[in-house]
Amino acid sequence: MTPESLLASASINIGLAVVALWLFSVLKKQPRNAVVYYARRLSDRHHHRPLSLHSSLCLPRFLPSVAWIPRAFRVPEDEILSRHGLDALVLIRLFKFGIRFFLMCSLLGASLLLPVDYYNESDLPTRREYSMDAFTISNITRGSNKLWVHFSCLWCISFYALFLLHKEYKEILVIRLQQMKELRHRADQFTVLVRQVPLCPEHNTRGCAVDHFFSKHHRFSYHSHQMLYDGRDLEYLLGKQKKLKKELEDKRHTEILSNGSQEHKQISTSEEKLREITHMIYHLQSETMLREKELPVAFVTFKSRRNAALAAQTQQHSNPLELITEMAPEPRDVSWRNLAIPQKILPLNKIGVILAAALLTIFFAIPVTAVQGIAKYEKLKKWFPPAMAIEFIPGLSSVVTGYLPSAILKGFMYIIPFAMLGLAYLGGSISNSKEEIKACNMVFYFLMGNVFFLSLISGSLLDEIGEYLTHPRDIPSHLAAAVSAQAEFFMTYILTDGLSGFSLEILQLGLILFDIIRSYTYGRGKERTPYLFSFPYFRVIPTVSLSIMIGMIYAVVAPLMLPFLVGYFCLGYIVYFNQMEDVYETTYDTCGRFWPFIHHYIFVSIILMQITMVGLFGLKSKPSAAIATVPLILITIAYNEYCKIRFLPSFKHFPIQTAVEIDEEDEKNGEMETHYVDAATAYNRHQPCLERVSSAESPTNLSQPLLGTDSI
């Protein structure tokens, strides 16, 4: 890739970003767009916060502004934590980690690495003229002592990354434990999820077995339980009932306006259908029918957090395949349909998910290889001679090779997070948060394999496969060379993902167009509701982590990329802070359980950076530097093992010490009984089939709580 191609990519991405941000700053002032740009603040839970919209046709309403940008840097972390939860704060701190790390690397690169790379005694003028290699480690001659500068920078960057990681892990853990104390009213702190519940031999019901077991073995701490039921039939009928009630309201409204006999007849028919469905629901919700639909799953509530944590983290039954316990997710986080999946089928589901993810990865190797073919224009002309026609249009070849490959790749990659989230759902996770965490893992490794490694192989090594087969020992050296050769492509990828990607994220162009089409077609005359969606951690975290990985690997190899990454993380911080404040809803809070996975992604990035440098030092005939880098790899691995021992268990489990401290605080304030009694009924309000419909009720007011905590 030539400097002209890189300049074309930067110009296009900067232009798109400026236009998108300009449009956003104007469109968000228009009252009709509030359902898109202020969806969270318009929702019922956050409607108390006023909106500053221009209702009159005044000039400021149509002028762009940047007032929303400094807002992101003014809000303290404590306020983010109280408004959005610790998961949102973890994402914000991920962007801050990127800013701090790459800012230091940029200063180091500008002061040491760039001068050393550029002013080399054996620079090749032709390479400096036609490529960016003059600013990379590729410009250093074999065996040069200048490589010790790169070696020193590698150690410095690695230790700084480990220092930041340790600092973040420690601080987030402290905030997590404090947040658990602040959220002591949450039902999941008192509740244990029990799976594989056996049948009671006396009464032939599972609810009875749960009650007998915990009453006997947790006599003084057990409070109550709630069985789960196969409510697919009930959910279907409840949905049908809701639809009929809405239709009935519309027909009554029409009758008032028209005062016709035809409308009165239709209303009578709808009321009769509604009564029939109500009786069917009432029948299915009888205790006899519910017992027949019992699932081997129960939520068991304890009288203290300490006893709940002990029960969740210990083996209950002599047969480890029965009465399997774990801390329950919070009620709004439960994946109700996955709880109905039998435990013995879950391993098959997981194998199927792994196979599907592998097939998806292989399938996407085709477009990635094609994209790299476009990026290498000289090779593209050999493979596809008609491509030479673009040379007749001035500047077009720079656009095609500089901007188009990264834009196409980003377009293909957009659908991957949603596909992986669907696969994670099929894996049978008990909560939505665990589904998102699994999706994060799959998306990150998919991006690492397809976007990074496959881009290296298909872009730099495709024409040397035969040589690899004949000389397999040279593969590490060739891979190290490939990393250096692909610096320009990944620079354009960072530009596209950051400038264009973040700008289009905040613009929400697709949703704006959909809202306009809906308003003038099937949604005409209907009330417009906010487009409120859950925050897409599964999409944001892996993408940002991939950019950290690319930046780390190229921190010593191509320091010219580092300032672009500082801009990438600054823009990402501003954009996603705005989305948290105004657009996306926080539907659950895991109290920071995303961080250990983010830590792992960054650890993998550091290891890849160090291994790449070992290969590059070998390629540059500096074996002493390569050997001296091996202890750094071992230190990094040892540090990661330390973090697994020191921090990770407190994210996986509910520490007994913390549970006791919260219990003591509750007992001191006289709130313990209130909290565990509320916890006993919290899950009833979220399971669809636990809503009773009485046959004596009015057809338009048909729901009330179904059962108590012991539904047996």
From Swiss-Prot:
Entry keyword annotation includes rRNA-binding: no
Keywords: Calcium, Ion channel, Ion transport, Membrane, Transmembrane, Transmembrane helix, Transport
Cellular localization per UniProt: Membrane
Pfam families: PHM7_cyt (PF14703), RSN1_7TM (PF02714), RSN1_TM (PF13967)
Alphabetized InterPro entries for the sequence: Csc1-like, CSC1/OSCA1-like_7TM, CSC1/OSCA1-like_cyt, Csc1/OSCA1-like_N
TM ranges: 6-26, 94-114, 146-166, 351-371, 407-427, 442-462, 494-514, 546-566, 597-617, 623-643
Calcium as UniProt keyword: yes
GO cellular component, one term: membrane
Topological category with respect to the lipid bilayer: Multi-pass membrane protein
Disulfide bridge positions per record: none
GO molecular function, one term: calcium-activated cation channel activity
Superkingdom of this protein's organism: Eukaryota
Family from the record: Belongs to the CSC1 (TC 1.A.17) family.
Function comment: Acts as an osmosensitive calcium-permeable cation channel.
Protein name: Hyperosmolality-gated Ca2+ permeable channel 2.5
Organism from which the protein derives: Arabidopsis thaliana
Gene name of the record: OSCA2.5
